[in-house]
Amino acid sequence: MAARLCCQLDPARDVLCLRPVGAESRGRPVSGSLGALPSPSPSAVPADHGAHLSLRGLPVCAFSSAGPCALRFTSARRMETTVNANQVLPKVLHKRTLGLSALSTTDLEAYFKDCVFKDWEELGEEIRLKVFVLGGCRHKLVCVPAPCNFFTSA
């Protein structure tokens, strides 16, 4: 299964936010083992922020306090080019899905951070919006009727 997500840096709160492609809200911030991406305090997030979002199509782990499970997020743009040809990242992700030996979670996190922060901070891109693919997750899909709160759904 794969869910297409937008990834956007919120400079006001210094967090990385995710949302389903096509949704109007900025989604929830990534937290947990991604390192320098802090989770906002409850008072920093309006109670109704993202309440209109439909969560269909996203795996349960997308709403875990530790963030999505092992595969994390992979830049769709990078997967479509030869940038990752030496590691053939889509094949690596597929191997992880099957439980075979592949890149460690730490390596995948480093790859993700490089995709995002190198482009945004070093190259100075003005449009801080990328499309990412969350793939290979074995968790069941979230099936909750909209409206629901994107930040508090489990």
Curated annotation (Swiss-Prot):
It comes from Hepatitis B virus genotype C (isolate Vietnam/3270/2000) (HBV-C). May form homodimer. May interact with host CEBPA, CFLAR, CREB1, DDB1, E4F1, HBXIP, HSPD1/HSP60, NFKBIA, POLR2E and SMAD4. Interacts with host SMC5-SMC6 complex and induces its degradation. Interacts with host TRPC4AP; leading to prevent ubiquitination of TRPC4AP. Interacts with host PLSCR1; this interaction promotes ubiquitination and degradation of HBx and impairs HBx-mediated cell proliferation. Residues 68-117 are annotated as: Mitochondrial targeting sequence. Belongs to the orthohepadnavirus protein X family. Pfam families: X. Multifunctional protein that plays a role in silencing host antiviral defenses and promoting viral transcription. Does not seem to be essential for HBV infection. May be directly involved in development of cirrhosis and liver cancer (hepatocellular carcinoma). Most of cytosolic activities involve modulation of cytosolic calcium. The effect on apoptosis is controversial depending on the cell types in which the studies have been conducted. May induce apoptosis by localizing in mitochondria and causing loss of mitochondrial membrane potential. Signal peptide: none annotated. Keywords: Activation of host NF-kappa-B by virus, Activator, Apoptosis, Host cytoplasm, Host G2/M cell cycle arrest by virus, Host mitochondrion, Host nucleus, Host-virus interaction, Modulation of host cell cycle by virus, Transcription, Transcription regulation. One of its GO terms (cellular component) is host cell mitochondrion. A fraction may be phosphorylated in insect cells and HepG2 cells, a human hepatoblastoma cell line. Phosphorylated in vitro by host protein kinase C or mitogen-activated protein kinase. N-acetylated in insect cells. This is Protein X. One of its GO terms (biological process) is symbiont-mediated activation of host NF-kappaB cascade. InterPro entries: Transactivation_prot_X (IPR000236). The gene is X. The keyword Nucleotide-binding does not apply. It is found in: Host cytoplasm; Host nucleus; Host mitochondrion. It comes from the Viruses.
